[in-house]
């Protein structure tokens, strides 16, 4: 064919290829890319195949499907809250307590009393449950004569108690007690006539010791109780230590020996202890008795029966001078106040009259200085019940409270729960405890009552309880 390039035709023929006519021969297929790269023409004419579909979901994969946290934890929280509420509601309630709201002490107005103390020796005055009213002189051990018999009687009654109205055990009189009656009369001792083989009641033997101050009977009781006077004296000193009588030494049961020494302060301690025994107090206050022989024996303490004096014991000797351990009881609006005092070493003649007169002057001035004050009035709020969970219920005095004291004295107030404890619930006006003013036997106690209804703690209080 004229004009056709002979080179191209020769190449086709030499390769042995034949060209088939194509209806779309207007489009020429592009050669494959080299080196695995796709050209722009490839991208335009032959787009890449779609990605393969994901593999089917397995059961393990399904377990890892995310879960809503609210759905997981809400039931747990609700369960814990329910358990908490149940536990709080069922926990044992704390024991209710009484709390005092008025002042815990009361001070009497006025000045401390100025008392007529003796010009010699030593003296001490105390009010039972209130404390020391005053003291005079150096508290050093001095002979106390027959005041020692207070300890003798106290030890006998401690070792061999007597019921009120009874006479106690039987004490057989020995030969020594009979002989000491005769020798005692010769030497000017206080003695009572007895005969060996006689039987004295324990009560009558103590009467002989406390009223006519019989030395021979004091020694008889010592031998009867302990087997010997020396053994009994050891008991006396042991009891003295128990009572805190550290400046006291007993060397005989009668007090005749000047080596039996004590102080006014120590004897007042013994007086307080001894007067707690009703039989001792009865003996100490007797003015006379009739003995086994029909003789009337007098108490040498002439103060008994006047000026509220109820005891206790005299003692006199040349070495000791005049000595007296005394007690008085005065009634203040229905409350009995015991006052115990001791005066030692009064040597002005007549020594017994001197100590009795000076003691009476001192005692009566002391009793005049005592007064009764209204500390709390009926209906006054004195405290509250604390239920332990924040609840409070007022507590009121059911009557006036009067305390005994003297100028400047401070007495203590306390609010005490009943023995079986404070209840969790009670109606208004129910007794709920005791208000105490003072201490020991002179303390005044009145019941206190609820000012309004006492209710058990509410569910809300139980729920919010932390402790």
Label each PLM-derived region with a short phrase.
Residues 90-93, 369-467:
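Conserved SxxK-family serine transpeptidase/carboxypeptidase catalytic domain
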Residues 128-130, 159-160, 174-178, 224-226, ...:
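Solvent-exposed coil/turn segments that connect beta secondary-structure elements
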Residues 281, 285-374, 382:
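A penicillin-recognizing enzyme superfamily signal
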Residues 73-89:
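Hydrophobic membrane-insertion alpha-helices, especially the h-region
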Residues 93-265, 272-281:
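Active-site-adjacent loops and short helices of periplasmic peptidoglycan-processing enzymes
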Residues 105-106, 304-313, 414-419:
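Short Pro/Gly-enriched beta-strand edge/turn motifs at strand-loop
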Residues 1-70, 74:
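Terminal targeting segments of Actinobacterial cell-envelope proteins
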Residues 113-115, 197, 314-319, 425-426:
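Short Gly/Pro-enriched turn/cap motifs at secondary-structure boundaries
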């Amino acid at each position: 064919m004229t004009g056709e390039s002979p080179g191209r035709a020769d190449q086709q023929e030499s390769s042995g290829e034949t060209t088939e006519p194509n209806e779309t021969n207007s489009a020429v297929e592009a050669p494959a890319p080299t080196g695995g790269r796709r050209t722009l023409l490839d991208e335009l004419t032959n787009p890449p195949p779609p990605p393969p579909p994901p593999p089917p979901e397995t059961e393990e994969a399904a377990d890892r499907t995310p879960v809503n946290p609210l759905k997981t934890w809400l039931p747990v929280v609700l369960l814990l809250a329910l358990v908490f509420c149940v536990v709080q509601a069922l926990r044992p309630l704390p024991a209710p307590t009484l709390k005092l709201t008025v002042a815990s002490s009361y001070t009497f107005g006025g000045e401390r009393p100025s008392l007529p103390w003796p010009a010699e020796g030593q003296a001490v005055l105390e009010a039972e449950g209130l404390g020391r009213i005053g003291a005079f002189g150096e508290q050093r051990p001095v002979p106390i004569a027959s005041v020692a018999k207070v300890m003798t009687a106290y030890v006998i009654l401690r070792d061999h108690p007597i019921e009120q109205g009874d006479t106690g055990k039987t004490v057989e009189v020995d030969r020594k007690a009979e002989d000491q009656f005769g020798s005692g009369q010769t030497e000017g001792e206080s003695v009572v006539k007895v005969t060996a083989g006689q039987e004295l009641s324990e009560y009558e033997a103590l009467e002989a010791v406390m009223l006519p101050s019989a030395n021979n009977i004091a020694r008889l009781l010592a031998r009867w109780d302990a087997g010997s006077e020396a053994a009994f004296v050891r008991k006396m000193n042991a009891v003295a230590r128990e009572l805190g009588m550290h400046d006291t030494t007993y060397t005989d049961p009668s007090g005749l020996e000047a080596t039996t020494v004590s102080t006014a302060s120590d004897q007042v301690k013994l007086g307080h202890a001894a007067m707690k025994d009703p039989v001792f107090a009865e003996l100490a206050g007797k003015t006379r008795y009739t003995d086994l022989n029909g003789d009337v024996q007098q108490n040498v303490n002439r103060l008994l029966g006047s000026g509220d004096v109820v005891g206790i014991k005299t003692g006199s000797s040349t070495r000791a001078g005049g000595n007296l351990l005394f007690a008085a009881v005065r009634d203040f609006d229905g409350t009995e106040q015991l006052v115990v005092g001791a005066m030692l070493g009064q040597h002005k003649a007549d020594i017994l009259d001197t100590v009795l007169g000076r003691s009476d002057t001192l005692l009566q001035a002391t009793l005049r200085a005592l007064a009764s004050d209204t500390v709390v009035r009926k209906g006054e709020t004195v405290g509250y019940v604390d239920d332990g969970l924040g609840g409070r219920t007022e507590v009121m005095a059911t009557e006036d409270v009067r305390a005994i004291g003297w100028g400047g004295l401070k007495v203590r107030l306390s609010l005490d729960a009943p023995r079986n404890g404070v209840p969790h619930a009670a109606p208004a006006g129910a007794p709920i405890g005791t208000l105490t003013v003072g201490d020991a036997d002179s303390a005044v106690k009145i019941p206190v009552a609820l000012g309004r209804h006492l209710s058990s703690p509410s569910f809300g209080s139980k729920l919010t309880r932390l402790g």
